[in-house]
Amino acid sequence: MARNRSRRDDNLRRQVAYLAARLMAEEGIADYAFAKQKAARQAGLADSHGLPDNREIEAALREYQGLYQSASQPAELKHLREVAVKVMREFAGFNPLLVGSVLNGTANQFSDITLQLFADDPKSLALFLLNRRYRFEQDERRVRLGDDWARVPQYYLEVDGAPVTLAVYSRGDEHLAPRSRPESDGPQRARLADVEALLGR
């Protein structure tokens, strides 16, 4: 009986991971927690007990993309990484770090390029953008920095058809800035040289 229940739970985890991966691949949901919750509802689960973790969902996403998006996703990822390199070169004075799906290789047509930037004065980025005539929107996001919470300015712009999110931290917070999802395999942040290496440059 216990073995059957365990097998059933494993099957449900795999089903939810697959459904979450499909939502991320086909509907552009970027948030793992939201995709997981929506997938659980689709699977008819009333609570969050025994749901897959981010690593399982990421593995399912890679499998889904390999099966159903192999003709398009690699080219989309390459374009986003090329744009990321372009932006990181232009914003080199802010010590940019690439995070998220463009780095881990699961990005697709719906994905943003997400960069962490570092400045003595966060307002200096707004001046930098204005001087280069970028059109952008701005807000703030509450994020955890070490043991504390902070409001981090976020700038949203478009470069070569790709949406770019710039999160601006104080220079002293580089070692505290979020490192993407802690469960994910592989590097969670990358400097310009690392991204260039991914492109074979």
Describe each region flagged by the PLM.
Residues 2-29, 36-109, 120-201:
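Catalytic core of pol beta-like nucleotidyltransferases
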